[in-house]
Amino acid sequence: EIYETILKEMQSAGSSGEFYTPRALTEFMAEIVNPQIGEKMADFACGTGGFITSWLGELDKKVKTAEDRKEYNQSVFGIEKKQFPYMLCVTNLLLHGIDTPLVYHDNSLTKDVLNYTDGDKFDVVLMNPPYGGNEKSDVKSHFPSDMRSSETADLFMVLIMYRLKKNGRAAVIVPDGFLFGADNTKIAIKTKLLRDFNLHTIIRLPGSIFAPYTSIATCGGCSRRLFYKGNVVLSFGYARGLQAFLQDKIYEVGTLRPNP
C-alpha cells in the first residue's frame, strides 16, 4: 500500500516529459503483444516498471512448470535514467517475485545504435518514451546522421528499431508530433519504420487517458498514439465519435469499430 501511494504521488510529468503510464494502459499493451514463455521483453525508459510488471502479469498466466518459472524470472530488462524511479522499479520487481531484476540506472541513448548485435536485441519492446525533451549533440551522435533528431521520443523510436529482433513485436506510445512531423529527420525515421517493419495498428488515445496529468505545459493537450509493430499488414483504426474515455475503459478500444 505504501508503494502504491508513492506511485500515485509521482503521477506527473517532469522537465523531460516523462509519464508514469496508467496501469490500465500498460496492461492493455501487454495483453496485445501476447507474451510467450522464453521471450525477452525490454523497456528502455522503464520508469517505475509499469510495463515490466504488466508483461509479467500476462506471462504468469502461461507458467506451467518450474522451467517456465525460471524463464519468467529472466524475461524482463529495463533501463531508467533517473535514480528515484529506478529504485522504485527495482522495488516493484522485488515485490513481484523477481529476485535479481535486470534493471539498470543508465541512459539508453548514449550508445551507438549501429554497434548493437543480435545478442542485444529483444523479442518484445513495451514503452512510453519520454517526450518533449531535447537531446544535445553528444547524444544525437550515437544515431545515424539522417535520424539525429533533437526530440527524445524520436530517438527512442530509432533505438527500438535497432534493438528489436527479427519477427519481434513492439507496442509504443508516441506523441502526435511523431506521426505528423514533416521535417527531414522525422521523415527518415518513419521511412525506416515503414520500410523495415510491418506497422500493424495505430490506436488513437485521447488525452483523457492520462487525466488529470495532461494539463501540464509539456503535454499541451496533444493526443497520443499507440504503435504496434509485428509481421502483419498495415491496418488503421480508432474509436471514432469518442471524445474521451476513462482509464478503466481502455480495454474496450480493442473491440470498437469505426462508424460507417
Where are these regions (language model features)?
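Short, flexible segments with low predicted structural confidence
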Residues: 1, 61, 164-165
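Long recognition/docking surfaces used for binding and targeting
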Residues: 1-10
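Conserved S-adenosyl-L-methionine
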Residues: 18-127, 132-134, 150, 154, ...
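A conserved structural/catalytic subdomain of Rossmann-like adenosyl-cofactor enzymes
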Residues: 117-260
